[in-house]
Amino acid sequence: MNSVDTVVVGGGHAGLAMSYCLADRGVEHLVIERGDVGQRWRDERWESITLLTPNWATQLPGFHYDGDDPDGFEGRDGYVSYLERYARSFGAPVQKHTAVTRVTVTAQGAYLLDTLSLIHI
C-alpha cells in the first residue's frame, strides 16, 4: 500500500493550484487524476468553448498567462495546454489514469483511498 499524508483528487485547475500551494510550502503530496491533466476540459467541453474572462486575467498561483493574445479568450485546447505547462512548471506530482472509487476512514482515523488501478493510498 502506498502512503502519503496529503492527497489532492483531481488534476484540473483547482487541483493543480492546490498542488502548487502545497509544494510551495514543502508539503509532500500526490495529485490523483482519472485521466490526463485537465481531463474534463479535454472530453467534457465543446470544441468551440472559450473562457469567459480575457487571457490576461487567467492566472494560477505562480503562473500567469504566457501567450501572445492577452485580450483574447482562450479556447478549450489552449486552456488544456496552459494547464499542462502549469503542471510541468513546478513538477506537479500527478498520478494520471487513476480514478478514485472510494474514500474510507480506518479505525485509526486515517483515510484510505481506493482506485480503479488497484492502488491503495
What label would you give each PLM region?
Residues 112-115:
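SH3/SH3-like beta-barrel fold
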Residues 4-30:
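N-terminal Rossmann-like FAD-binding beta1-loop-alpha1 element of flavoenzymes
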Residues 119-121:
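Conserved small/polar residues in nucleotide/adenosyl-binding loops
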Residues 96-109:
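A conserved short coil-to-beta-strand element within the FAD-binding core of flavoproteins
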Residues 42-80:
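Glycine-rich active-site loop/strand segments that organize a redox cofactor
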